[in-house]
């Protein structure tokens, strides 16, 4: 009798076999085949892919659209660290640099859920969209208003007449509007430049194409590391984001079970992330979030709360 294989999610191929002494060579051959098949048996099919890539439709996996912000980080960690594989969760994380593009996927039929902010969700619902979605996991993040390092902007009162990169009908829009009103500036005292992509918004700030930018982590920390100035950090309560699940997916027995496994994967991921830097976390930041290795120590991530 071969010893039990060290993982429970192997499918029909990964079974125990018994052999008589007269068929020892055959048994060894089958054992070798089992060992060769072991990596495939262990995989749940969890993947990370570009949202722009047209992947074949896969109704057997749980598909979520994620913008590359700190709020989505636990989902990437759960895939890269093998947490999803250990739970047998075939999670497909579709990656987007702009919230608008992630929302387009969420509102379509190519994913089962996605990450967006509460202002955008309210905006869509006011227009008769996103009414068939449930808030499934409340997420943690961190957002800041940054000013170009070469400009003489060191305080919020220096913002008059400046151009700020943000996105309309989103938490960044709400945040900079609240700051403008608190400074008693007129609507034409501050110029809003709509830049949906977080990556491009960050690059425009670095290249002095805009004076300021509202950026999520890890882009904000990268900007500070490059000499730009953090003028203000938003309160968590005003930049709330969540994973929303389509009710159609939750009514499906398979996807509902996968969604419950996703909660477990998320909780395991946040426990690990909250402990600080690790090879898996560094890998996610470098490979998925495109953080230069030299800036890893400068990244300031939020504390992540477990979901229930």
Predicted region positions:
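Bacterial signal peptide processing site
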Residues: 42-45
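Pocket-lining segment of extracytoplasmic ligand-binding domains
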Residues: 119, 192-193, 197-288
């Amino acid at each position: 009798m071969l010893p039990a294989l060290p993982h429970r999610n192997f499918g029909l191929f990964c079974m125990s076999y018994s052999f008589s002494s007269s068929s020892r060579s055959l048994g060894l051959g089958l054992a070798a085949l089992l060992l060769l098949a072991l990596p495939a048996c262990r995989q749940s099919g969890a993947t990370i892919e570009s949202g722009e890539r047209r992947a074949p439709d896969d109704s057997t996996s749980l598909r979520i659209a994620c913008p590359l912000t700190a709020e989505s980080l636990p989902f990437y960690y759960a895939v890269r660290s093998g947490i999803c594989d250990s739970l047998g969760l075939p999670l497909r994380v579709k990656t987007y640099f702009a919230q608008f593009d992630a929302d387009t996927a969420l509102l379509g039929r190519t994913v089962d859920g996605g990450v967006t902010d509460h202002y955008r969700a309210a905006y869509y619902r006011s227009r008769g969209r996103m009414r068939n979605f449930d808030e499934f996991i409340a997420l943690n993040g961190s957002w800041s208003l940054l000013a170009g390092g070469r400009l003489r902007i060191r305080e919020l009162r220096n913002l008059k007449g400046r151009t700020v990169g943000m996105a309309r009908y989103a938490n960044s829009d709400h945040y900079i509007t609240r700051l403008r009103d608190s400074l008693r500036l007129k609507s034409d005292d501050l110029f809003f430049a709509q830049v949906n992509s977080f990556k491009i918004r960050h690059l425009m700030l670095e290249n002095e194409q805009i004076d300021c930018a509202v950026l999520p982590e890890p882009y904000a920390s990268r900007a500070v590391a490059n000499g730009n100035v953090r003028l203000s950090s938003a309160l968590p309560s005003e930049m709330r984001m969540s994973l929303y699940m389509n009710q159609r997916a939750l009514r499906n027995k398979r996807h509902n079970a996968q969604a419950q496994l996703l909660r477990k994967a998320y909780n395991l991921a946040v426990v690990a992330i909250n402990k600080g830097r690790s090879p898996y976390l560094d890998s996610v930041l470098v490979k998925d979030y495109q953080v230069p290795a030299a800036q890893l120590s400068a990244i300031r991530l939020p504390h992540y709360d477990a979901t229930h």
